[in-house]
């Protein structure tokens, strides 16, 4: 489908690399939306941000987590990637460890040097990490990370069937709830680490900040994205979740569409739900799905309108796959 917006994007010269302005949200698949709403509000302390039929968003610390039912797409039962991490301080690390236990959520606390960490999953299987880089007094009691000489982490054991009617039923309403400080990172699987590093730095404008032993981190628009070839999975070919959304300002939106296409990235058409916001989907070379989101752009009046919003534009997610130079 050709639109005025797509033609305009293709005509923009790439004289200056456009930039994302921040991370908008991380949208995850879930098995049961009602169960997930209970988990993200009660256990994760999320604040309801947006809800429509079949989709809900919670604000947790400084990030929005979206949820929608899908047949698969969460972290594999034995996998470490993808996972999503939150910062918290030492006091809240201890509180959160006890909080997860009270809500019958299996978890694995461990340490890497002076950083205390906990892995756990939501009821669907999406893997989360808590990250406390200082101030946890009980750090010496935690087992070492596997790559520091500790035991292997049994990620399969962290899967569970959540009895949300029972879990947390005995919690004193006056008990202090843990607080997460900020979103720390999203760590994603990639098939080719060198290729992924080039894509995230050269195309998405990220800064390589860590690179060791099959794992790298790139800071993009203030958010850390981890990249690894260790066991994991990407967004499925025909799936919308998980996906990772970056903000773009109005002046950068169409230039970014052009920039992505000029760098060999297959994208959807710029589209809109309401004639005000601008949206675009694309994948990294491994297949992880990303969204570009502009809160308000005049050009949206000419963008294709989504079919669910009364328009005739349907996204072909499978068509976003492409081969990028390795």
Predicted feature locations:
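Hydrophobic, helix-prone linear segments
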Residues: 1-64, 71-72, 184
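Conserved short beta-strand elements that form part of the metal-binding/catalytic scaffold
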Residues: 4, 47-80, 90, 127-134, ...
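Conserved active-site tyrosine of GNAT-family acetyltransferases
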Residues: 36-41, 100, 125, 196-201, ...
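Conserved acetyl-CoA-binding loop of GNAT-fold acetyltransferases
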Residues: 42-48, 105, 203-208, 265
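Vicinal oxygen chelate
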Residues: 2-17, 23-31, 59, 75-99, 102-179, 262-326, ...
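Conserved small-residue-rich
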Residues: 29, 40, 174-219, 223-225
């Amino acid at each position: 489908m050709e639109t005025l917006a797509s033609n305009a994007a293709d005509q923009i010269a790439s004289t200056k690399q456009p930039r994302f302005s921040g991370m908008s949200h991380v949208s995850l698949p879930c098995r049961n939306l009602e169960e997930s709403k209970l988990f993200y509000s009660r256990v994760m302390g999320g604040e309801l941000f947006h809800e429509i039929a079949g989709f809900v968003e919670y604000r947790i610390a400084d990030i929005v987590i979206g949820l929608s039912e899908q047949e698969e797409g969460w972290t594999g039962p034995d996998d470490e990637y993808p996972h999503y991490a939150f910062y918290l301080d030492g006091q809240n690390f201890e509180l959160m460890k006890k909080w997860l236990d009270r809500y019958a959520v299996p978890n694995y606390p461990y340490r890497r040097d002076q950083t205390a960490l906990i892995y756990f999953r939501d009821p669907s299987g999406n893997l989360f990490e808590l990250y406390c880089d200082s101030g946890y007094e009980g750090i010496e009691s935690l087992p070492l990370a596997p790559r520091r000489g500790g035991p292997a982490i049994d990620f399969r054991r962290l899967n569970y069937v959540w009895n949300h009617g029972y879990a947390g039923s005995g919690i004193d309403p006056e008990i202090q709830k843990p607080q997460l400080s900020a979103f720390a990172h999203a760590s994603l699987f990639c098939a080719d680490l060198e290729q992924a590093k080039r894509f995230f730095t050269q195309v998405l404008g990220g800064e390589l900040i860590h690179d060791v032993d099959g794992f790298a981190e790139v800071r993009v628009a203030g958010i850390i994205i981890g990249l690894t070839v260790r066991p994991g999975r990407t967004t499925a070919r025909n799936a919308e979740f998980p996906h990772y959304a970056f903000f773009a300002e109005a002046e950068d939106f169409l230039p970014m569409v052009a920039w992505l296409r000029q760098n060999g990235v297959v994208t959807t058409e710029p589209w809109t739900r309401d004639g005000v916001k601008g949206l675009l989907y694309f994948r990294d070379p491994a297949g992880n799905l990303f969204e570009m989101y502009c809160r308000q752009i005049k050009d949206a009046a000419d963008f294709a309108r989504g079919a669910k919003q009364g328009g005739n534009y349907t996204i072909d997610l499978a068509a976003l796959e492409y081969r990028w130079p390795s």
